[in-house]
From Swiss-Prot:
It is an enzyme of class 3 (hydrolase). It comes from the Viruses. The active site is at residue 101. It comes from Tobacco yellow dwarf virus (strain Australia) (TYDV). Keywords: Activator, Covalent protein-DNA linkage, DNA replication, DNA-binding, Endonuclease, G1/S host cell cycle checkpoint dysregulation by virus, Host cytoplasm, Host nucleus, Host-virus interaction, Hydrolase, Metal-binding, Modulation of host cell cycle by virus, Nuclease, Nucleotide-binding, Nucleotidyltransferase, Repressor, Transferase. Residues 267-295 have a biased composition (Low complexity). One of its GO terms (cellular component) is host cell cytoplasm. This is Replication-associated protein A. A motif (RCR-3) lies at residues 101-104. Residues 163-175 are annotated as: Oligomerization. There are 3 rolling circle replication (RCR) motifs. RCR-2 may be involved in metal coordination. RCR-3 is required for phosphodiester bond cleavage for initiation of RCR. Its cofactor is Mg(2+); Mn(2+). Belongs to the geminiviridae Rep protein family. A divalent metal cation binds at residues 53, 61, 63, 105.
Length: 295
């Protein structure tokens, strides 16, 4: 029993903007332009652009954009066939984008005047636009997408959150101080700290200048601090100083001189004060004087 003949797909082209592609076409762009211009004259054709593009094997194929003044109603699938070359036929939804695409290599010929036309947005685009324009917060934006486009919400949530942050940038948090203004006030005795640290001559620094023992250096510094405080034993007009290379007044030694702590220009922290007024020497430290002896 013979098989029933297969039904051919019905063809119908209803549009004012047509995009044709002739693969491996042996005809020239000029022949195709003239052929289509004549064939579409009943639809009041006003623009046509044809571009030639080469395949990797060197054979050409032709792209064609057609703009009509009247909507076509073509039912014959072979309507655009030229010399045995059958094209791929599509409506050109956006003539400007099609013309830009076929002109990318610059090998294009045209006839007539190109006209931009309004491109009707898809229903999906309209729904997205409504969400973008009506949402008032990031949460509402994502909820609306979840309702309208659940598949996109489930598979592209990371990108949707990115767009939500662009539409509704996070507001910076107001800084709340964890301390009061009173905490910023300095309560330390800076003068005492200055005297004990900035104007302080250490035992080690003193011994770098004077060849004395650790005990002698300690004793000398305590004695100099006492002298600086009461201004005794210094020449008139000489300011007190604990500089390690100063000319130090000579003094007599006693066991009490080794007591106390090392101090600087601040208040004396000696555990005992000298009661004997020392004699002065213009060339040696107190310890050096004691080492040289006296007659």
């Amino acid at each position: 029993m013979p098989s029933a003949p297969q039904k051919t797909k019905s063809f119908r082209l209803q549009t004012k903007y047509v995009f044709l592609t002739y693969p491996r076409c042996s005809s020239s762009a000029e022949n195709l332009r003239d052929f289509l211009w004549d064939k579409l004259s009943r639809f009041a054709i006003f623009f046509i652009a044809i571009a030639t593009e080469l395949h990797q094997d060197g054979t050409p194929h032709l792209h064609c954009l057609i703009q009509l003044d009247k909507r076509s109603n073509i039912r014959d699938p072979s309507f655009f066939d030229l010399e045995g070359n059958h094209p791929n036929i599509q409506p050109a939804k956006n003539s400007e984008q099609v013309l830009e695409y076929i002109s990318k290599d610059g090998n294009v010929i045209t006839k007539g005047e190109f006209k931009k036309h309004r491109v009707s947005p898809s229903k999906s685009d309209e729904r997205w636009r409504t969400i973008i324009q009506t949402a008032t917060s990031k949460e509402e934006y994502l909820d609306m997408i979840k309702d309208e486009f659940p598949h996109e919400w489930a598979t592209k949530l990371q990108w949707l959150e990115y767009s939500a942050n662009k539409l509704f940038p996070p507001q910076p948090e107001i800084y709340q101080a964890t301390f009061t203004e009173e905490d910023l006030q300095c309560h330390e005795d800076l003068q005492l700290w200055r005297d004990q640290h900035l104007y302080h001559v250490s035992v080690d620094a003193y011994r770098l200048v004077h060849n004395v023992t650790l005990v002698e250096a300690h004793s000398d510094l305590v004695w100099m601090d006492d002298i600086s405080r009461n201004l005794e034993g210094l020449e008139p007009g000489s300011p007190p100083s604990t500089s390690a290379d100063q000319v130090v007044p000579e003094r007599q030694h006693g066991p009490e001189a080794s007591e106390g702590t090392i101090t600087g220009m601040g208040p004396s922290t000696s555990l005992s004060m000298m009661t004997t007024r020392p004699t002065t020497s213009s060339t040696t430290s107190p310890s050096n004087s004691s080492h040289s002896g006296s007659n």
